[in-house]
Amino acid sequence: MEERILVCLSSSPSNGKIIRTAAQMAEAFNGTLTALFVETPLAGKMGKEDQERLKGNIKLAKQSGAEIETVYGDDISFQIAEFARLSGITRIVIGRSAAKKKGVFAGTSLVEK
């Protein structure tokens, strides 16, 4: 069975490391790499710096051989799981911020879900 690796894209400064790790996994398993961005209603409120970082992360994913996909929805974890299920993804690579989240983003982290 071919390994199908899914890496989740974000504007996080650490996302580049996650993308490189996923690309190495895809190469090691002789599999395919897909990079997924979940666009939420809050994506339009992203600051200029975050927008530029996201563009850079998308570019890195493309350079790493990933097929770039975008889905839309409010529930990021649901969108990732549903995309993975429908696409036959065998492994999901996501990062987790070490920083405490406040305000709108408080609560259970994506990794914990």
State the predicted function of each range.
Residues 96-113:
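Glycine-rich, Arg-bearing micro-motifs that act as flexible, cationic patches
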